[in-house]
């Protein structure tokens, strides 16, 4: 008995985490619509705190007892704060079975019908305080009801429906209206490949507009219409047109549906057609429509049951409401409506760490701090603190360069990007290998043959102090932002899948990285990087093996599935500079990678920590050699994750950020202890980037700024300053990251980072001007750097040039404008 208990405890400690099988959504009832009989086909609008329900239709007497359908014009407003309904301004006339498209402050209502006819009217309704504001928009080209509509970007799309109550054929038409246009007008777009339909499911996800199921109308023997229930489904994107996706497992006619996150589409119930033709015979004994909730996942192209809802409403609209989805009234069985209103919110579904995971996390992070304490004894001078006494082995320097560039963002994001797309970005990683050649042959000699500590000392020697200080300031400001981001983004991913508090994650990473960097300087940074690279790549390899082991068909099955789904696509053979064409990827990323490898103090500083230039070159070549290996592992892992979750879509957690997919797999599938170690390694990857930034920024501030204005300061004083700066910078970065996680400052922060990102190309352009020209001078170089930022800002905003080419634009503009300006101004200052 004791042995059995110990066995169960052991299994609890080591087995992979499993998410419980509870329904994904938790439902609660809101006050019922004051319309006692309920309504089908109402128009709805909401702003997150209030809900407007207008129009609709119902039967005062059951149709199976001879009753006729009644259209209504009454409207009701629900106040979430008061938790009560009040009467609102009625519609101009009875109306139902139109489409309601949610916008931020209300909705757009499209088409609809009454007892006599269908309508083409389109109106925008806004909830402004206690007032309802109606604005007419251009009417549809044709009257329509029983259709569907969504907003994708700034464009409203309308699909299907029928022209009149007695139509025996459904529309196979697709209309679009750009609501942001100064003079909006409807245009007809190519329709989906399948038949026309009424009452389809239609939802917009990140990758396009989805149209699924519905019912095709066919003439019957009496001259009326009968229905054929459909399960086909399609995706539309303005740039790619229509593509067929996986059929729904059953018909979803008239089902309310909503997007959940950017990749999941939830369908609540719907008429599956199983009792449609039996409805007259069943009459009041009809059991109602299905309660089943289905989840379509766009990345894996799979449908998954997600439990049941407490309602069976059809012909109503699901609208986003606060952090959930709201379903107001609807038809719960043929001829019968329900006034019930339900709000669904996500149940807690995060995986949780087990005891061994916490042990692994604590041991790993403790070891990193121990490294800092160990090397603190050797950091007695600023040369030790900034350059490790120039005694770093070449292989350690190479691993550290690799670890600095492979941030936790990359470690998490690369598999996630491949998981969600294909292998086109393979060449992005391999282009770093190309960048190694000019770095070693052309740049490294200039950095090594003068005994410098800061990379920007070269600019002082080649140009003047103003150029040096401009470059140093640009680097420092950019790194301050980067430090906060490399703490914040991984913390989000880790928190969502492990349950670790996001603020605690940020604090742990920020405090520990600051501690060991302040203690051990660059030597602690380099050796912790070495450990982290080994653990990260080893952990990624283990995760890949586990994923392949759990795949039906193993490695061969993976490649068969991936090839069939075009997930292994690598090359885009086109000259189009707006796409990820082969030449765009290679040429663009050659220049993008030249920016950090030639002008980033955090990277250049590693070149200066080895004994000789030859050893520094060997470190750079080692970094380049590691990239194909790590790229193959991470890209294969991304594809394996896609195949794994395609086979087990029920293991996905809807609504989680795409970048959480790898941490989710770690937490779910790896044994206890192993999962903890790899999650710790993700923490450590953040810390690896942070520690490099802390030390390099402290170096730049001390060497470029403090020494210039306090040249007589003793080395001991400068060392104390460097350690103090490290602590202060760590506190600032951690504080900014905590603010990002606590307050809604995202848009402001994004804007500031975008502005700082404009300076990177100009920074690399300054070094290129200094190394490859003789006549470039300080004033011309600064003009080129400033021009680079403005030109790149214009390119980003006013053109469709692919982002991979931004580095080329930035460096090229600085070089060309800087050289031309040098020929026109202060020619005597050229070197």
Report each predicted region and the residues it spans:
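Kelch-like beta-propeller repeat domains
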Residues: 22-353
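Generic hydrophobic/packing signal
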Residues: 14, 89-95, 104, 111-114, ...
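Serine/proline-rich low-complexity intrinsically disordered segments, especially terminal tails, linkers
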Residues: 6-9, 48, 300, 831
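N-terminal secretory signal peptides that target proteins for export/translocation
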Residues: 1-5
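Bacterial N-terminal signal peptides
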Residues: 8-18
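Short, intrinsically disordered, charge-balanced linker/junction segments flanking boundaries
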Residues: 17-21, 810
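Residue-level detector of alpha-helical hydrophobic segments embedded in or interacting with membranes
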Residues: 11, 26-29, 133-136, 153-154, ...
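Membrane-embedded helix-loop-helix hairpins and adjacent transmembrane boundary segments
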Residues: 349-831
């Amino acid at each position: 008995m004791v042995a059995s208990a110990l066995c169960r405890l052991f299994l609890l400690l080591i087995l992979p985490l499993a998410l419980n099988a509870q329904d994904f959504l938790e439902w609660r009832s809101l006050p019922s619509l004051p319309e006692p009989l309920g309504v089908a086909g109402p128009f709805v609008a909401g702003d997150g705190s209030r809900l407007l329900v207008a129009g609709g239709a119902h039967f005062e007497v059951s149709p199976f007892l001879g009753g006729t359908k009644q259209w209504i014009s009454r409207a009701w407003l629900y106040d979430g704060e008061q938790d009560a309904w009040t009467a609102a301004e009625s519609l101009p006339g009875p109306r139902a079975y139109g489409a309601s498209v949610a916008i931020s402050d209300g909705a757009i209502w499209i088409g609809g019908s009454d007892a006599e006819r269908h309508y083409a009217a389109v109106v925008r309704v806004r909830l402004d305080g206690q007032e309802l504001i109606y604005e007419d928009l251009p009417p549809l080209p044709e009257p329509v009801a029983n259709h569907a509509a969504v907003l994708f970007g700034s464009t409203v799309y309308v699909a299907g429906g029928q022209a009149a109550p007695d139509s025996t054929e459904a529309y196979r038409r697709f209309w679009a209206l750009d609501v942001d246009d100064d003079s909006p007008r409807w245009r007809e777009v190519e329709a989906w490949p399948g038949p026309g339909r009424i009452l389809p499911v239609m939802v917009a996800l990140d990758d396009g507009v989805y149209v699924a199921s519905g019912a095709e109308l066919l003439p019957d023997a009496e001259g009326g219409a009968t229905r054929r229930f459909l399960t086909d489904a399609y995706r539309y994107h303005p740039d790619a047109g229509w593509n067929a996706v996986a059929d729904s497992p059953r018909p979803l006619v008239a089902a309310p549906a909503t997007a959940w996150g950017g990749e999941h589409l939830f369908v609540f119930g719907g008429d599956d057609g199983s009792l449609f033709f039996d409805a007259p015979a069943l009459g009041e004994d009809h059991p109602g429509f299905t309660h089943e909730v289905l989840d379509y996942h766009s990345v894996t192209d799979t449908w998954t049951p997600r439990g049941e809802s407490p309602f069976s409403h059809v012909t109503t609209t699901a609208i986003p409401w606060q952090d959930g989805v709201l379903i107001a009234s609807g038809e719960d069985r043929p001829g019968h409506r329900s006034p019930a209103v339900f709000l669904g919110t996500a149940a807690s579904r995060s995986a949780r760490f087990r005891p061994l995971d916490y042990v692994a996390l604590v041991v790993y992070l403790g070891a990193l701090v121990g490294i800092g304490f160990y090397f603190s004894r050797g950091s007695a001078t600023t040369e030790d603190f900034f350059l490790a006494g120039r005694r770093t082995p070449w292989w350690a320097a190479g691993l550290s360069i690799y670890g600095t560039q492979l941030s936790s963002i990359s470690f998490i994001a690369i598999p996630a990007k491949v998981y969600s797309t294909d292998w086109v970005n393979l060449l992005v990683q391999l282009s770093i290998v190309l960048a190694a050649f000019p770095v070693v042959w052309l740049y490294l000699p200039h950095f090594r043959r003068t005994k410098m500590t800061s990379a920007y000392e070269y600019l002082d020697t080649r140009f003047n102090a103003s150029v040096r200080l401009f470059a140093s300031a640009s680097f420092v400001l950019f790194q301050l932002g980067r430090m906060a981001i490399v703490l914040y983004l991984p913390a989000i991913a880790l928190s969502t899948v492990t349950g670790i508090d996001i603020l605690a994650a940020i604090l742990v990473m920020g405090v520990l990285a600051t501690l060991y960097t302040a203690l051990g300087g660059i030597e602690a940074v380099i050796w912790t990087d070495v450990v982290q690279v080994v653990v990260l790549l080893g952990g990624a390899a283990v995760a890949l093996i586990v994923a392949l082991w759990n795949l039906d068909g193993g490695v061969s099955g993976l490649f068969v599935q991936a090839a069939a789904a075009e997930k292994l696509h690598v090359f885009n053979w086109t000259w189009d500079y707006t796409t990820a064409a082969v030449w765009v990827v290679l040429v663009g990323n050659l220049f993008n990678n030249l920016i950090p490898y030639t002008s980033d103090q955090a990277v250049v500083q590693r070149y200066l920590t080895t004994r000789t230039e030859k050893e520094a070159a060997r470190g750079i070549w080692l970094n380049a050699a590691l990239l194909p290996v790590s790229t193959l592992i991470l890209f294969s892992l991304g594809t394996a994750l896609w195949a794994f979750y395609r086979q087990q879509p029920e293991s996905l957690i809807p609504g989680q950020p795409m970048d959480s997919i790898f941490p989710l797999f770690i937490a779910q599938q790896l044994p206890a202890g192993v999962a903890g170690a790899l999650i710790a390694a993700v923490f450590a990857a953040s810390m690896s980037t942070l520690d490099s930034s802390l030390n390099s920024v402290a170096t730049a501030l001390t060497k470029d700024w403090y020494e210039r204005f306090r040249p007589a300061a003793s080395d001991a004083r400068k060392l104390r300053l460097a350690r103090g700066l490290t602590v202060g910078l760590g506190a600032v970065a951690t504080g900014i990251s905590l603010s990002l996680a606590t307050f809604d400052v995202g848009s402001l922060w994004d804007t500031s980072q975008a502005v700082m990102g404009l300076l990177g190309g100009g920074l690399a352009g300054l070094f290129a001007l200094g190394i490859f020209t003789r006549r470039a001078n300080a004033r011309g170089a600064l003009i080129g750097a400033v021009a680079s930022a403005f030109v790149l800002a214009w390119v980003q905003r006013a053109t469709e040039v692919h982002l991979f080419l931004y580095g080329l634009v930035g460096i090229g503009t600085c070089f060309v404008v800087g050289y031309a300006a040098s020929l026109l101004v202060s020619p005597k200052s050229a070197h």
